[in-house]
């Protein structure tokens, strides 16, 4: 019902405000109450200033503002209150719309300046609890699967309030706030927490939710409320509703905080925003924030590192497997009811699954809109045809729970691959799956193929990286050896040392090409380099050939003898440096053969064994 205000706009008016003795179930927003109090106070002042002589036969100025034809009596105050609430109801913004109140209108502009208008945020159905219905008027439902309900009294057409929505109202009304778990005081945020706090004299908050829920519904025959299966489905649906309720509570807190800061924010944007504990406390969630202790605990929990890690992990999991579907608020059971009403035939579980994940090609229903769902369905079809034959009609035939169990590799994370939540858990067991297991290898999914390809690329990258590291180490060692030999040559008055060619380490049974070690075209003996020299060490698969036969055995230090050269002791009978007598380690002789100091070229030729008859054997007399 609408009424015209002074500006010509239509505004909704309340038809009933209840009896005078009954308490108001709706108090209105803060702005509404503030404006109402200001107008009533102004009305009393105007009535008092008019004097007793003006009360008879004359209307006051305040009464003219509210209702020109009404006398200034208590009834005028009631109508003024109703008019103010009607304006405030139109001006109050819904949370989802993000509108702001514009303050008082022209008639109350002066009064509104006394209290600046605040942003009015009103919530819908959050704290509205319907009274219990008579038994014959309650909605008839039937338990399905592990957490689903089928509404028997619904014909599958039109709009209806989802059953989980009604259950969520009961859960919020009987919210236990702070509970004790493991000796610690925490805010209830799991369905099991509802059972940790008593409600009344002989029950808990769980029993209160149970009573409130069955005040709106009744179970169909042959089920009764005493059946364990009914209790199992109720607990499963309540657990799911609590998770969704707490998830949306954080998003609501982020949305309200951002709007109070003057920023636009919706639920999708709030998913990626994490506030601090203080910022959460500055916001509100209507059904939760009035429990001050529980609200403060939840604000601290939402801002903790533990929650951030869990939130980011779950968000990445959802992004990796989006799980796009078209079930909407009806869910699987509601979608089946609408399909039955449209087609006149009760659909099978697979037909509902395909309808909820309908792909682009109607001629190929097995190709769905989501790759993950397509892979699950393909594995299910393979299992069904392997069990019942290649001509089995998998779409319209009876749903095979065992094939669905195998298609998902069991029940990872407690979820069945197809029909999770609508298939009773008692219809499949791990024992039946393993006893009837198939020897046929499972077809790898596209995600597994991507992971395998990434692992192969990583292994190839690691192999290339190791090869580069080895090459760098080889270059570094060669550079260090070159610097070491160059320093030794400068110390003993020799020209800069030229690094000899690197000879590849010969494979067993083969001899290296001695021509790579020959210098100036001289002809040497037929003895291979492997017979003449011992390797100093293998560097990067290559051998350095300039070390003597036993490079690690150093002779004792003698007087007037410089330290041994880094590449080992020089050939027998030769001096370590020019100007020193040659040393012969002959046993018992003690004689030293004086010989002229060799020049540098002779020393290098002998050292590198590049002369035709040079060898490591001592000279013969």
UniProtKB/Swiss-Prot annotation:
The keyword Plastid does not apply. Residues 27-39, 47-61 have a biased composition (Polar residues). Residues 570-594 have a biased composition (Low complexity). GO terms for biological process: transposition. The keyword Transcription applies. Keywords: Activator, Mutator protein, Repressor, Transcription, Transcription regulation, Transposable element, Transposition. Residues 1-119, 428-447, 498-530, 549-621 are annotated as: Disordered. This protein has most probably three functions; the mutator (M) function, for excision and transposition; the suppressor (S) function, which inhibits residual gene activity of certain alleles in which inhibitor elements are integrated; an activator (A) function is proposed, because inactive SPM can be activated by a second SPM. PANTHER family: AUTONOMOUS TRANSPOSABLE ELEMENT EN-1 MOSAIC PROTEIN, AUTONOMOUS TRANSPOSABLE ELEMENT EN-1 MOSAIC PROTEIN-RELATED. This is Autonomous transposable element EN-1 mosaic protein. It comes from Zea mays.
């Amino acid at each position: 019902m609408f009424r015209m205000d002074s500006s010509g706009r239509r505004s909704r008016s309340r038809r009933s405000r209840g009896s005078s003795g009954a308490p108001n179930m709706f108090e209105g927003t803060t702005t509404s109450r503030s404006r109402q109090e200001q107008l009533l106070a102004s009305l009393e002042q105007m009535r008092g200033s008019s004097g007793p002589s003006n009360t008879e036969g004359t209307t006051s100025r305040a009464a003219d503002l509210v209702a020109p034809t009404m006398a200034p009596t208590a009834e005028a105050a009631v109508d003024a209150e109703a008019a103010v609430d009607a304006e405030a109801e139109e001006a109050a913004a819904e949370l989802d719309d993000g509108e702001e109140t514009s303050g008082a209108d022209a008639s109350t502009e002066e009064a509104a300046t006394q209290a600046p208008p605040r942003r009015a945020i009103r919530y819908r159905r959050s704290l509205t609890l319907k009274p219990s219905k008579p038994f014959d008027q309650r909605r008839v439902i039937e338990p399905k699967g592990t957490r689903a309900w089928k509404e028997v009294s619904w014909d599958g057409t039109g709009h209806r309030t989802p059953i989980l929505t009604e259950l969520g109202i009961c859960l919020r009304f009987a919210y236990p706030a702070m509970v004790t778990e493991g000796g610690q005081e925490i805010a209830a945020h799991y369905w099991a927490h509802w059972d940790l706090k008593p409600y009344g004299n002989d029950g808990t908050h769980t029993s209160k939710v149970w009573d409130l829920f069955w005040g709106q519904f009744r179970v169909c025959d042959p089920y009764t409320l005493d059946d364990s299966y009914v209790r199992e489905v109720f607990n499963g649906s309540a657990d799911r509703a609590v998770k969704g309720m707490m998830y949306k509570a954080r998003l609501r807190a982020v949305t309200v905080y951002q709007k109070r800061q003057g920023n636009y924010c919706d639920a999708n944007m709030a998913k990626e925003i994490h506030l601090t504990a203080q910022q959460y406390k500055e916001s509100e969630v209507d059904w939760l924030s009035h429990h001050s202790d529980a609200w403060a605990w939840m604000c601290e929990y939402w801002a903790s590192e533990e929650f951030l890690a869990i939130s980011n992990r779950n968000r990445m999991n959802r992004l990796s497997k989006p799980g796009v579907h078209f079930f909407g608020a009806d869910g699987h059971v509601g979608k089946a009811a609408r399909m039955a009403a449209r087609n006149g035939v009760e659909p099978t579980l697979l037909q509902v699954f395909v309808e909820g994940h309908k792909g682009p090609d109607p001629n190929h229903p097995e190709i769905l809109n989501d790759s993950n769902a397509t892979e699950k369905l393909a594995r299910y079809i393979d299992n069904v045809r392997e069990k019942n034959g290649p001509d089995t009609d998998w779409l319209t035939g009876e749903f095979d729970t065992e094939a669905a169990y195998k298609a998902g590799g069991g029940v990872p994370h407690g979820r069945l691959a197809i029909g999770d939540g609508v298939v009773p858990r008692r219809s499949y067991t791990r024992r039946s799956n393993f006893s009837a297991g198939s020897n046929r290898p499972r077809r790898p999914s596209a995600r597994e193929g991507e992971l395998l390809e990434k692992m192969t690329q990583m292994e190839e990258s690691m192999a290339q990286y190791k090869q580069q590291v080895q090459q760098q180490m080889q270059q570094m060692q060669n550079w260090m050896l070159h610097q070491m030999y160059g320093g030794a040559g400068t110390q003993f008055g020799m020209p800069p040392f030229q690094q000899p060619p690197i000879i590849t380490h010969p494979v067993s049974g083969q001899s290296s090409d001695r021509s790579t070690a020959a210098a100036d075209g001289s002809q040497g003996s037929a003895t291979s380099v492997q017979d003449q020299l011992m390797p100093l060490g293998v560097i990067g698969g290559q051998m350095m050939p300039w070390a003597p036969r036993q490079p690690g055995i150093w002779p004792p230090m003698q007087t007037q003898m410089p330290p041994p050269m880094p590449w080992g002791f020089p050939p027998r009978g030769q001096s370590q440096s020019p100007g020193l007598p040659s040393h012969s380690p002959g046993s018992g002789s003690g004689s030293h053969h004086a010989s002229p100091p060799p020049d540098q070229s002779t020393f290098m030729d002998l050292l590198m064994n590049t002369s035709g008859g040079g060898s490591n054997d001592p000279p013969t007399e």
